[in-house]
Amino acid sequence: MPILDKADVPREELSPGTDRWALVDGDKGAESLSVGDVSLAPGAKVPIHIHPTEEAMVILEGELEAVLGDETVTVTAGQTILAPPGVRHGFVNRSSGSARVMAIFPTARMERTLVD
C-alpha cells in the first residue's frame, strides 16, 4: 500500500498566488484517480476552465468566490462543489486569508482546458 507524502510532491504554479500539488495520479500508481491540493493566496484565482470528466472540489480552508456554469457563489470550508464534465468553473480568493481546495478526479490523468 503506497503512502504518499505532500512534502515529496513538487509544487506547480497554476497562476500567480495559486499552487497545486498532485498528491495522487497515474505517476504515483493510481489507475483511475487524481487528487490535487490547491492553495490560493488572498487575491489569487484558479482561472475558469473545463474538464472532460467530473470534478469534486472540497473546500478545506478559507472562503472563495466560485464560478460553476453561469452561477457565482461564495463557498467556505466544509463545502464541496461538483462540476459535471464540460461545465466551466473556477475560483477567486477575495478574502484576506489563504484558502485550500482538494480537487478530485475519476481519472489517473487530469486534463484541463482554460476557457475564459
Language-model features: where?
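Short histidine-centered beta-strand/loop micro-motifs
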Residues: V24-D25, V46-H51, V92-R94, T113-L114
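Glycine- and acidic-residue-biased ligand/ion/polar-headgroup-sensing regions
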Residues: E54-L64
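Short acidic-glycine-tyrosine-enriched beta hairpin
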Residues: D70-P85
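A generic "binding-loop/recognition-motif" signal
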Residues: A44, P52-T53, E71, V87-R88, ...
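A short hydrophobic beta-strand segment most commonly corresponding to one strand
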Residues: V38, L82, G97-R112
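Short beta-strand His + acidic residue motifs that chelate non-heme Fe in jelly-roll/DSBH
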Residues: I48, A66-V67, A83, H89-S95
